[in-house]
Regions:
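Active-site nucleophile and cofactor-binding loops and adjacent substrate-binding regions
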Residues: 38-45, 80, 131-132, 160-163
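Phosphate/ribose-phosphate-bearing ligand recognition and processing surfaces
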Residues: 40-42, 60, 64-83
Length: 210
């Protein structure tokens, strides 16, 4: 666990710039703790927030290492770490020119997720669930079935359940694979507060300097 990362997360929250951003109860308690420690979560938040790790590093091994680090600050259950690593690995493979069959095979063999279902098979019985093991595979399947960035997001949202998290995970992989249409990028950026836009621009600059 990286204490600097823990403090950084806590400091951002305690500035109270976004008090209604939908933090979970366990996360709120973690942030207010005097000495915050991981709380054994296998929730899908670790996968939802990991996409940057898939972009910033030059090797898959380093990507997996950093995905683990970002997860275990809070989500140190093996399933929480696995969900973050699978998502980051899929993004890394997508942005480095690997095909969908290659991405699917790697995720299945490395993390043991079942990616042989279809969105049509998932929808009838899917429900709101916030675990990595019942969110990350479905999000990856939504990407695998897609034909474009927007189609991937539509697939993810169409599953129901924790749709914003599904779309976040799917969208991270889809952008790495397809790119993001400029009109969607522009519209999204217009809706963000200035400080978050500045963070985005710094992130894009860092990617360009790799």
């Amino acid at each position: 666990r990286d204490p600097e990362m823990s403090r950084g997360l806590g400091d951002v929250y305690k500035r109270q710039e976004y008090p209604h951003a939908g933090y979970g109860g366990m996360f709120r308690r973690w942030l207010h703790a005097e000495n915050p420690k991981p709380y054994g979560s296998f929730g899908n938040g670790s996968a939802m927030r990991v996409s940057a790790a898939g972009w910033l590093f030059d090797t898959l091994d380093k990507t997996l290492e950093m995905a683990k680090m970002t997860a275990e600050v809070t989500h140190n259950h093996p399933e929480g770490i696995k969900g973050a690593q699978a998502t980051a690995a899929a993004i890394f493979l997508a942005r480095t020119g690997h095909s969908k069959p290659e991405i699917k095979r790697y995720v299945e063999q490395t993390f043991g997720y079942d990616l042989n279902r279809t969105c049509d098979e998932i929808r009838p019985t899917y429900h709101h669930v916030e675990t990595c093991q019942e969110t990350v595979p479905e999000a990856i399947i939504a990407f695998l079935e897609s034909v474009s960035f927007e189609d991937a997001l539509r697939n993810a949202v169409s599953l129901g359940g924790d749709s914003d998290t599904l779309a976040c995970i799917t969208g991270g992989i889809a952008e790495a694979f397809y790119g993001m249409p400029q009109e969607l990028r522009d519209e999204t950026l217009k809706r963000l507060p200035e400080d978050i836009r500045e963070g985005y621009e710094l992130f894009r600059w860092n990617i360009g300097q790799r």
